[in-house]
Amino acid sequence: MNINKQSPIPIYYQIMEQLKTQIKNGELQPDMPLPSEREYAEQFGISRMTVRQALSNLVNEGLLYRLKGRGTFVSKPKMEQALQGLTSFTEDMKSRGMTPGSRLIDYQLIDSTEELAAILGCGHPSSIHKITRVRLANDIPMAIESSHIPFELAGELNESHFQSSIYDHIERYNSIPISRAKQELEPSAATTEEANILGIQKGAPVLLIKRTTYLQNGTAFEHAKSVYRGDRYTFVHYMDRLS
């Protein structure tokens, strides 16, 4: 890297842009360790604080990650998720050539709240499956998913359902295909619990997704809240110009 101390462009920003270029062109590969802050500072004759600012910004953008006591490393490329199509997590990972998996955090059969009953269009009170899982890709935690599904639309559920695609089970159980979903996305920061589960730092960027999914007959069968790692996922929406 070359740093121009006479440039009006801040030094930390020059470091960021050059590291981005090295990551993009493959000079820096995923999981490759970077020199330490001290080494960068000595190499360019700048302060460690300036180096730390550049690296911290790239960590926040998901391009780098830190391991306590070991240093800073290059992140794996983010996976793009198109917002137009409706697929399950299992289907999505398989389409990428990855091995999907799930780890059950909690399961309860609960009584519906008024809010859930209104969203799902079920009676109140009625029995609701509440399933909280960590969704995995090649054994790497990608998201925390908490799903609420009316008992009458799923029947009894067991460990085998939690380890695979619940969407497949829902379609078989009801003999009706899944057709559409309403989805809301908003940025958030990982809580201590979320960070521990996902293997990221507390306060790291995450994507909070709320989704209500419907069968072809218009029946809402699931309301889910998911927390996706911001360093591994990016959501893309393609738009056509209206005539």
Swiss-Prot record:
**Statement: the UniProt record of this protein carries the keyword Disulfide bond:** no
Q: Which SMART domains match?
A: HTH_GNTR (SM00345), UTRA (SM00866)
Share an example GO biological-process annotation for this protein: negative regulation of DNA-templated transcription
Q: What induces it?
A: Expression is increased by growth on N-acetylglucosamine.
The residues that hold alpha-D-glucosamine 6-phosphate are F89, T90, R133, V134, R135, E145, S165, I166, Y167, E222, Y228
Described purpose of this protein according to its UniProt entry = Main transcriptional repressor of genes involved in N-acetylglucosamine (GlcNAc) transport and utilization. Represses the expression of the nagAB and nagP operons by binding directly within their upstream regions. Binds to the DNA consensus sequence 5'-ATTGGTATAGACAACT-3'. Also acts as a weak repressor of mapB expression.
The name this protein carries in UniProt is HTH-type transcriptional repressor NagR
Recorded source organism is Bacillus subtilis (strain 168)
Gene name in the database record? nagR
